[in-house]
Amino acid sequence: YKRKGEYGRQYIIPIGRLDLLCEDSQGNLYVVELKKDSGYDDAYKQTAEYLDWFEKDKRFKGKKVYGIICLNSPTQQLIDKVHADKRMRLFEYQISYTEL
């Protein structure tokens, strides 16, 4: 997302600091939260609060806003919460290292 020369990471809004704010060619916004490991059940609440803020802010009126949470080993509770919210998607990443 670009704002007067700023784009990419750490987009700041009054209620917090987004890891990434992205915009597609149709003007839809994507709040991306990146978590370094598991144990982030509050990631849903945090992302939902960000989405609610964008939906209420007049500067973003008419834009669709979605949340994307990326983390390693999400709990079933987090999976269930995200699947129940049509605004959000959940991605799990895995890292492996191989000695060469």
Task: List each language-model region with its residue ranges.
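Charged, terminal alpha-helix-loop-beta segments
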Residues: Y1-L100
